[in-house]
């Protein structure tokens, strides 16, 4: 059982008692996800592959097919191919919501249970939606920054891309700072890239002689931020707060690194939650339709070990 699932679902949801009864009940779940083109996606692929093995062991009649695609067009073609294999359910993290909505609709038209992960479709045709909490990531981050700075300080923000989930995170962060004397003195897009974040942080360091903390909402970008701070030799920055749960950052939290004292989860392992729920719906006939939003958990030294996956690429 994945450590991430501890406390997220009732123990009865994945009880093994009925597994033997399902041995002759053959079903197929297809998992369609982007190829590992960056760290977070690499983590998604890792957790999907690990969960596929766990589910096939839990339900002897189950076959799980994990298919990665390099772009939206390839993913649409993959969905068409997967439906020819007689699948009962599809777990899909779309490359692009607009491009994949109609191909997913076609799969659903073949009486296939649809679970969408992370990126919502243009039209909510899915049976189950599993995602991280984007506003929650901003809210939890703001609360931590306020407390860590004692309610007063100068913060720079490195945003992701100019899309909805970035707006949700940043708006919640700004709202969470209200009532304090913590000020956002600069904000730029880092495109969820460690190289771009490195350049943005270099600019911040040149422009601002005093920075108390950095919020960059993403652990890949935090890597670039840390390198920029190191090269500049700056000692005024008290800490950097990223997000997602990259193993390198979680390890720093575990080890008591003063520069990375915490992290906020937006876990790639959400795909495993989606797969678990989908299988439970197929085999245990549990009412799993609807939305399942994972908490934006604050990772500290006290709980970091529960979210550390040393074998994951992310």
Where do the protein language model's features map onto the residues?
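Gram-negative bacterial Sec-dependent N-terminal signal peptides
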Residues: 1-22
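A residue-level marker of the well-folded mature domains of exported/periplasmic proteins
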Residues: 3-4, 21-314
């Amino acid at each position: 059982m994945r450590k991430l699932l501890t406390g997220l679902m009732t123990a009865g949801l994945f009880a093994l008692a009925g597994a033997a009864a399902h041995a002759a009940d053959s079903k197929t779940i297809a998992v369609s996800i982007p190829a590992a083109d960056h760290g977070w996606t690499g983590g998604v692929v890792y957790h999907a592959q690990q969960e596929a093995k766990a589910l096939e062991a839990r339900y002897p009649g189950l076959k799980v097919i994990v298919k990665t695609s390099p772009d939206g067009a390839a993913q649409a073609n993959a969905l068409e191919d997967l439906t020819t294999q007689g699948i009962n359910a599809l777990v899909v993290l779309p490359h692009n919501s607009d491009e994949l909505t109609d191909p997913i609709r076609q799969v659903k038209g073949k009486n296939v249970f649809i679970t969408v992960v992370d990126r919502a479709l243009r039209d909510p045709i899915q049976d189950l939606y599993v995602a991280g909490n984007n506003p929650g990531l901003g809210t939890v981050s703001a609360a931590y920054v306020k407390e860590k700075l004692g309610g007063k300080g100068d913060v720079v923000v490195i945003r992701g891309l100019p899309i909805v989930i970035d707006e949700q995170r940043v708006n919640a962060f700004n709202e969470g700072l209200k009532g304090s004397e913590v000020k956002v003195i600069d904000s730029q897009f880092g495109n969820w890239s460690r190289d771009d974040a490195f350049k943005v942080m270099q600019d911040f360091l040149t422009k601002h002689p005093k920075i108390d903390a950095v919020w960059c909402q993403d652990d890949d970008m935090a890597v670039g931020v840390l390198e920029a701070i190191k090269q500049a030799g700056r000692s005024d920055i008290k800490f950097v707060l990223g997000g997602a749960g990259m193993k390198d950052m979680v390890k720093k939290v575990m080890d008591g690194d003063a520069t990375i004292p915490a992290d906020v989860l937006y876990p790639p392992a959400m795909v495993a939650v989606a797969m678990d729920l989908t299988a439970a719906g197929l085999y245990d006939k549990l009412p799993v339709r609807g939305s399942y939003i994972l908490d934006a958990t604050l990772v500290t030294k006290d709980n970091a070990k529960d979210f550390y996956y040393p074998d994951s690429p992310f």
